């Protein structure tokens, strides 16, 4: 089983190499530096699904909020 969490992109750290693209992502106020190499089209304000430090997809705000509610109900 793997756990991937939604977070909101709060800043991008530009890099000329898209494989090294990183950004700051907020998880309920906890800010982490995350690799955005798999989602190079991401923008500040977007929600991403993050697994082991890598954003693996972009999701809309509604889907992110639903996931956060589900996780809270499970006590995660």
Curated annotation (Swiss-Prot):
It comes from the Bacteria. Pathway: Protein modification; [NiFe] hydrogenase maturation. SUPFAM superfamilies: HupF/HypC-like. InterPro entries: Hydgase_assmbl_chp_CS, Hydrogenase_HupF/HypC. One of its GO terms (molecular function) is carbon dioxide binding. GO terms for biological process: protein maturation. Involved in the maturation of [NiFe] hydrogenases. Involved in the biosynthesis of the Fe(CN)(2)CO cofactor. PANTHER family: HYDROGENASE MATURATION FACTOR HYBG. Belongs to the HupF/HypC family. This is Hydrogenase maturation factor HypC. It comes from Synechocystis sp. (strain ATCC 27184 / PCC 6803 / Kazusa). The gene is hypC.
